[in-house]
């Protein structure tokens, strides 16, 4: 008999992350015989642009997608409103579908997952995606000096323990995060209950052998990057990435190598150029490009090396940067800082780049670029061993099998 799963995501499927880190897994699990209903919260503009394409993907893969719309304002109250909005939909679906399992991505949707488990006895997967509550505080979103945010923080810390203890399975992005959870000594939280599944990458898409060398060379010429040492960055910068420190690192590179810092990001270019100017980096030595996700693999091959420095705070123990998976898959050396998830350990194990120490949350102990130990084939092998999307699907399948086909 076909098993039925309800997947809840507060992230939209029309967001790039929704497509790469949710839909791909659901499609893989659907092929193994799980029938999925997917509820996600979509941003109106993104839905207008991408909604039809996502509907088509879901139709082709027999996924019952039920998009709802994300409420942005007023903050806090808007999230409550979204939860109130989702519950009647789920109640109706539960009546008709009789779900066997509810898979909740992060904390907000886990409030619903826990309720469904208590009311209907449905198996509940807490796919925690990191220490979300602490991220909100460390990222300056929740100011604990405010009584309102202090109350919300305490509420979710209490719920966090309930999600961990009452769930049937937990997914952590990192081994460092898993070890931290085990140190909390909570009831019913064991090593066997926690699976580590990092942010994975589709190795068919991020495959340097599948990209024409002449096309990359033409792109390099078009962007005037020939005879330059290209230091790259990919992705948004946001709250967590240390742009000032990355610029400081770039400045240490020998001018004789004619370096240029190329950032592939949809963030406002002028803000980045202004930061570079403050750091006394000439405009001709920095280039900001907005690139479609489908064109990222080819653009990564422009890089001679890539850098990302992330704030090494408590919550980042559970961080798994997707960019690391993509860069290693493409055989690009990665320069990162220690204290962020499993990133440094993976770089060192697979000789995939260079790790720099973190002096504190906001400062990296920058040393000169040194890629003498870099091994391109080992880095690509590391991506296959650790970040392969197919392996990620199999790890989720192990969880589903254990919960849905338990021996009686």
Give short role names for the model-derived ranges.
Residues 373-389, 398:
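A short, well-ordered alpha-helix in the C-terminal region of glycosyltransferases
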Residues 1-55, 60-66, 171, 248-256, ...:
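N-terminal subdomain of nucleotide-sugar transferases
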Residues 6-8, 225-241, 247-250:
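Conserved donor-binding/catalytic core segment of Leloir-type glycosyltransferases
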Residues 87-92, 111, 115-119, 132-134, ...:
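Membrane-proximal helix-turn-helix segments that form the acceptor-binding/catalytic region
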Residues 50-57, 207-224, 378:
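A short helix/loop element that forms part of the nucleotide-sugar donor recognition site in Leloir-type
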Residues 16, 241, 290-299, 306-328, ...:
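Nucleotide-sugar-dependent
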Residues 176, 200:
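Carbohydrate-associated surface elements
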Residues 264-265, 270-300:
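Nucleotide-activated donor-binding/catalytic signature segment of Leloir-type glycosyltransferases, i.e.
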């Amino acid at each position: 008999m076909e098993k039925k799963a309800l997947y809840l995501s507060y992230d939209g499927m029309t967001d790039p992350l929704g497509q790469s880190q949710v839909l791909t897994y659901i499609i893989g699990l659907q092929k193994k015989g799980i029938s999925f209903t997917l509820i996600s919260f979509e941003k109106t503009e993104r839905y207008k642009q991408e909604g039809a394409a996502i509907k088509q993907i879901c139709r082709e893969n027999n996924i019952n997608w039920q998009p709802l719309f994300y409420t942005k304002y007023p903050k806090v109250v808007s999230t409550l409103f979204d939860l109130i909005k989702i519950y009647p939909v789920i109640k109706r679906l539960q009546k008709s579908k009789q779900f066997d399992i509810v898979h909740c991505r992060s904390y907000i949707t886990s409030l619903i997952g826990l309720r469904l488990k208590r009311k209907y006895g449905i198996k509940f997967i807490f796919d925690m995606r990191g220490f979300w509550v602490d991220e909100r505080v460390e990222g300056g979103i929740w100011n604990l000096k405010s009584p309102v945010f202090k109350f919300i923080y305490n509420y979710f810390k209490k719920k966090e323990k309930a999600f961990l203890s009452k769930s049937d399975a937990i997914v952590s992005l990192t081994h460092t995060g898993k070890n931290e959870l085990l140190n909390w000594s909570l009831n019913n939280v064991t090593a066997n209950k926690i699976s580590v599944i990092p942010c994975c990458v589709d190795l068919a898409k991020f495959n340097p052998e599948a990209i024409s060398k002449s096309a990359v060379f033409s792109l390099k010429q078009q962007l005037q990057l020939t005879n330059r040492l290209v230091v790259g960055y990919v992705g948004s910068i946001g709250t967590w990435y240390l742009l000032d420190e990355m610029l400081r690192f770039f400045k240490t590179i020998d001018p004789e190598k004619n370096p240029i810092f190329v950032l592939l990001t949809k963030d406002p270019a002028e803000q980045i150029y202004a930061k570079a100017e403050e750091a006394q980096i000439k405009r001709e030595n920095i280039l900001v490009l907005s690139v479609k996700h489908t064109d990222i693999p080819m653009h990564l091959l422009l890089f001679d090396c890539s850098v990302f420095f992330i704030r090494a705070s408590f919550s980042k123990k559970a961080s798994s940067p997707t960019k690391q998976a993509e860069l290693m898959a493409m055989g690009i050396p990665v320069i990162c800082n220690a204290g962020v998830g499993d990133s440094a350990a993976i770089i060192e194990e697979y000789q995939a780049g260079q790790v720099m120490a973190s002096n504190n949350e906001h400062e990296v102990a920058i040393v000169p670029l040194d890629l003498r130990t870099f091994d391109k084939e080992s880095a690509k092998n590391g991506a296959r061993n650790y970040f392969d999307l197919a392996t990620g699907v199999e790890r989720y399948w192990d969880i589903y099998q254990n919960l849905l086909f338990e021996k009686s």
